[in-house]
């Protein structure tokens, strides 16, 4: 297999390193802006050179972002080349266009490293779907948020201090918005739900709330009451269709999620026959992520393409009623659903997920967490 590697950053360099001594996978091109010297590899900025080379059968997209990543991926598929990517934002955003194009052109596409880094989560979901119905998916999908919340819980740190530590260690970007506002997790749970349920979720119907507004006083109150706060993703089958959302969640001490440390991920599925099973590991990093890119390349060599067919676009309906801890919001609606006071916040009576997320849009300084 001759591959063209798009991008030579953290993941791209990792893929190059892991394929260097393989006889079945050959990096023929690297497309990047940097001036790097790689023995036996053509380093270029001219993507048309790759598209015109019929000996290149697979493109590995490791650039990140939406553009030009999607433009390059789309052009590769239209040129009859297989594609592997670790780019969850691109795969999620263009899912409705991507899968039909892959099918039309008769090429193979995989994106295992897009969710869970080195865990192999999407591959496992594809295997599960061969045998049975997946009932629900979700869990801790973002290592940055888990590191921040873990340090706030274990060390009593303020949010800003825990975030700065994560940035110093390379777990958080200089601009951490995609992580702490839940967008990274949102992309991942939508991709996971699409694969698990064989649909394409309408992204506008999947609400998301992050951890940006959490304070040390919240965490102290949770700890006192036997809870640990985690950013939890949820995708599930319901009696009326499908539900999907991302929100901080208070996990009882008895829950496995409550004990996931540092920047690790724990992602879970429940099957009708297999029951509840979880995958645990590093959700990011050069070699864990590159490892699953290479695993995808090996699957392409075996003729294995995407994990599941897509039956069409569906809307998520999040009418499940949960109790929520809320701090920072104050209006007549919140007062009407308040059941009790917890420290500086309140706890609601059970309210629908969609309803409280719609209310939250007008409360920019509010912190919200579901209670299990």
Q: Which positions does each model-derived feature cover?
A:
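NAD(P)-binding Rossmann-fold cofactor-contacting core
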Residues: 21-39
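Catalytic, metal-anchored helix/loop core of enzyme active sites in primary metabolism
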Residues: 135-138, 146-149, 153, 165, ...
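Substrate-binding/catalytic subdomain of NAD(P)-dependent oxidoreductase enzymes
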Residues: 161-259, 264-266, 285
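Rossmann-fold NAD(P) dinucleotide-binding segment
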Residues: 45-86
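Oxidoreductase and adenylate-handling cofactor-binding alpha/beta cores
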Residues: 119-134, 145-160, 187-201, 296
